Each structure stands twice: as C-alpha cells, then as structure tokens.
Amino acid sequence: MTIILGLDPSLSCTGWGVIRAEGSRIAHVANGQVKTDAKAPIADRLHHLHAAIAAVIAAHDPDRAAAEEIFINKNPQSTLKLAQARGCVLAACAAGGLAVNEHAARLVKKSVVGTGGADKAQVQAMLKVLMPGAQVAGADAADALAVAIADANLRSIANLRSP
C-alpha cells in the first residue's frame, strides 16, 4: 500500500489530495485547498503555503508526492507567481522527505479520464466514479486528486513492464 500526495500548486489556491493506492485499487484519504490572501505580501503568502503543505504532510505521512509540471502562461508575472508557489510546495515536500514525481497536465487527464484534452468537469466526473462518496473541496483539490491518481496509475504500469 502506498500513500500519495497529489498537488496542484498556485499562489492564490493550491489544491492537495491524498490517496491510498494498492495495485490498481485507489481510495480517497483526504483533500483540501490552501488559499492565500491576495492583499498580503508575497513572502507572507509563500510562508503560509509552505506551512500549510508541511502540515498536510505531517498529518497524512505520504510515501511520495506528485505535482503537475509547470506550464508557461502568456502573462510572465502569472508564470513567475506560479513558479514561486510551486517552489514553495516542492520545498515543503523535500523538507518532509518526499520524492516528487512530476507529470504533464495532458498525461494526468489521459490517465484519469482517457483523453488528454479532458476539461475540468470531465475530470471531476471521473473522480466521482473512481472515489464514490469522496467530498472534494473544490476544483483545485480535484486537480490534485487527479495528479495523485495519475501517479498511482503510471507507477502501476511501470511495475507491470519491469521484469
């Protein structure tokens, strides 16, 4: 059994989701969102984000983490803020002793829904099928759960291929 922490980093609202994976079976453990105050200084927002993710790691003791690869936005300021938030989240994982697997957004969607072009509604609908009864905190938490599920699926496939 493996506990996986999925992460969808953002400065305004970072989603997180924890699943338990055993072979091809997955189970929902917990999920949530870390919101930061847009009016606060960026250093305070990043500190809050780091502390919150560190608390999630301490509470759920995952075996590994997974995050979406960064994408380049048309707005350089938005890309910079995303990179800063992502760095904070990855640093919290490293401080907690977690390896972080990174996956492209299209690969996450393909692994969970079956098509890399799936929209957020399709991902959320599939989460309801894969984890019936799970109360998902919001769109960012749903994305984080999808990242964790994709990581579990990709690891299962890799294990099947190895001799």
From Swiss-Prot:
Report the SUPFAM superfamilies cross-referenced here: Ribonuclease H-like
Q: Which cofactor does it need?
A: Mg(2+)
Q: What are the entry keywords?
A: Cytoplasm, DNA damage, DNA recombination, DNA repair, DNA-binding, Endonuclease, Hydrolase, Magnesium, Metal-binding, Nuclease
Superkingdom, natural source: Bacteria
Q: How is the cofactor bound?
A: Binds 2 Mg(2+) ion per subunit.
Binding positions for Mg(2+) 2? E68
Question: Catalysed reaction per UniProt?
Answer: Endonucleolytic cleavage at a junction such as a reciprocal single-stranded crossover between two homologous DNA duplexes (Holliday junction)
**Role of this protein:** The RuvA-RuvB-RuvC complex processes Holliday junction (HJ) DNA during genetic recombination and DNA repair. Endonuclease that resolves HJ intermediates. Cleaves cruciform DNA by making single-stranded nicks across the HJ at symmetrical positions within the homologous arms, yielding a 5'-phosphate and a 3'-hydroxyl group; requires a central core of homology in the junction. The consensus cleavage sequence is 5'-(A/T)TT(C/G)-3'. Cleavage occurs on the 3'-side of the TT dinucleotide at the point of strand exchange.
- Record protein name field: Crossover junction endodeoxyribonuclease RuvC
**Organism from which the protein derives:** Erythrobacter litoralis (strain HTCC2594)
- The gene name on file is ruvC
